[in-house]
Curated annotation (Swiss-Prot):
Gene: arcB
Localization of this protein: Cytoplasm
Protein name, as recorded: Ornithine carbamoyltransferase, catabolic
EC number: 2.1.3.3
Entries under InterPro entries matching the protein: Asp/Orn_carbamoyltranf_P-bd, Asp/Orn_carbamoylTrfase, Asp/Orn_carbamoylTrfase_sf, Asp_carbamoyltransf_Asp/Orn-bd, Orn/put_carbamltrans, OTCase_ArgI
Species whose genome carries this gene: Pseudomonas aeruginosa (strain ATCC 15692 / DSM 22644 / CIP 104116 / JCM 14847 / LMG 12228 / 1C / PRS 101 / PAO1)
Taxonomic path: Bacteria, Pseudomonadati, Pseudomonadota, Gammaproteobacteria, Pseudomonadales
GO biological process, one term: arginine deiminase pathway
Signal peptide: none
UniProt keyword list: Arginine metabolism, Cytoplasm, Transferase
Amino acid sequence: MAFNMHNRNLLSLMHHSTRELRYLLDLSRDLKRAKYTGTEQQHLKRKNIALIFEKTSTRTRCAFEVAAYDQGANVTYIDPNSSQIGHKESMKDTARVLGRMYDAIEYRGFKQEIVEELAKFAGVPVFNGLTDEYHPTQMLADVLTMREHSDKPLHDISYAYLGDARNNMGNSLLLIGAKLGMDVRIAAPKALWPHDEFVAQCKKFAEESGAKLTLTEDPKEAVKGVDFVHTDVWVSMGEPVEAWGERIKELLPYQVNMEIMKATGNPRAKFMHCLPAFHNSETKVGKQIAEQYPNLANGIEVTEDVFESPYNIAFEQAENRMHTIKAILVSTLADI
């Protein structure tokens, strides 16, 4: 079946087929090679892209900006403090204004409904840079990174996610693995598993792709034999620091430490994290937590010894944000 990525939204990956996802991964690989070899051609000259950030960002903003600049496009960074979004103007009205000026819009913020509304009224492609429910651009980077660090075909790669699985990373890792036929293990307290309706949707995709989906409360069982171990921060952006106490109590058994990495039984296993990570007490938040919980001074969701070890490929994963976002922009906006 033929497909056309031109002028497509990227909101959750829910509506992208396996073939389309594989195409984006292959294009990401090709664009990365072209950048490394100095043979990249610009396909987005005279294109203008708006970047709306209601949540702060390092990797997503830099990845979109560099990807666009490499391809000859212009970007405008918009945050709530420097615009009328949410103050004097609704997202619906913002969409109808920006859609007349820009060729595409990226949104990073809170509820999925907001980016869906933006896509409904903008009239141009909209890309989800992160919402509370999904992180689709991160997923493409994660799978590209796993493919680069494994000599197995995608359907033979296994990975585990440990931690709060109700968030955008838990949801998205389950979804993309289900779409691509991978072996996905989610380890979390049952109260922090993805919602039942979402899991049911992913199981339907898994039936079509041959994916294996496992949800368990046992972290060591989850990581047994896996190729990659993923985690994320235990409190998401926007949640108060006061929420840490109960979450730490719930999630401490799911901390990625050397014991967990060795429990994989796979000497080639790698550690992945979408970043930023609280792996020591050198950040403001890390210091706050260490003062309250001295046993976490050497890492919260991941320990310092794992993060600074050869297990860690999170920085290559971060670089791949730019290559995969570039593939999204080119496949959607380029006149080729």
